[in-house]
Curated annotation (Swiss-Prot):
Keyword Lipid metabolism annotated: yes
Family note: Belongs to the thioester dehydratase family. FabZ subfamily.
Lineage: Bacteria, Pseudomonadati, Pseudomonadota, Alphaproteobacteria, Hyphomicrobiales
Cross-referenced HAMAP family: FabZ (MF_00406)
Signal peptide positions (record): none
GO CC terms in record: cytoplasm; membrane
Function: Involved in unsaturated fatty acids biosynthesis. Catalyzes the dehydration of short chain beta-hydroxyacyl-ACPs and long chain saturated and unsaturated beta-hydroxyacyl-ACPs.
Organism name: Rhodopseudomonas palustris (strain BisA53)
Top-level taxon: Bacteria
Protein name: 3-hydroxyacyl-[acyl-carrier-protein] dehydratase FabZ
Residue spans crossing the bilayer: none
Length: 151
């Protein structure tokens, strides 16, 4: 049974209030279904207009895997920051670790990536998440990421 939803739809305006990232390095468009078990789904609509496609690769554009990992981390950051309540609400998130990273299929312009993130551990201000990046329900990348929430 799935955990209850705390935040159904975090739009770009709320993401901008939550994360310090801005263009061209804000790599999620919204986060949906943030649950009480600290899971949620980040959504990224990949456009041919992304700056990375100028060099990756001009004749066959492929969304860089490292940017998918960053998208996972940003999704985890939104989940973590929005899940903390009270006076100790963090204002920043710092990427700490990447483990068990695998790239399975290329992501192309026109694809929509869903970053399915679930907390796998927490110690004080440090959080760890497992993420599966999916396009049309197919896993295209996966990784465990760690981050520290701070003010």
């Amino acid at each position: 049974m799935e955990s209850p939803i705390r935040f159904e739809n975090v739009d770009i305006n709320q993401i901008l209030k939550t994360l310090p990232h801005r263009f061209p390095f804000l790599l999620i468009d919204r986060v949906i279904n943030i649950r009480e078990d600290y899971s949620g789904i980040g959504v990224k609509n990949v456009s041919f207009n992304e700056p990375c496609f100028q060099g990756h690769f001009p004749d066959r554009p492929v969304f860089p895997g490292v940017l998918m990992i960053e998208g996972m981390a940003q999704t985890a950051g939104v989940i973590g920051i929005m899940s903390v309540t009270g006076t100790e609400k963090p204002r920043a998130v710092y990427f700490l670790t990447i483990d068990k990273c695998k790239f399975r299929k290329p992501v192309l312009p026109g694809d929509t990536i869903e970053y399915h993130m679930k907390s796998i551990g927490r110690r004080k201000a440090m959080w760890w998440f497992h993420g599966d990046a999916k396009v049309n329900g197919v896993v295209v990348a996966e990784a465990d990421v760690g981050a520290m929430l701070t003010d």
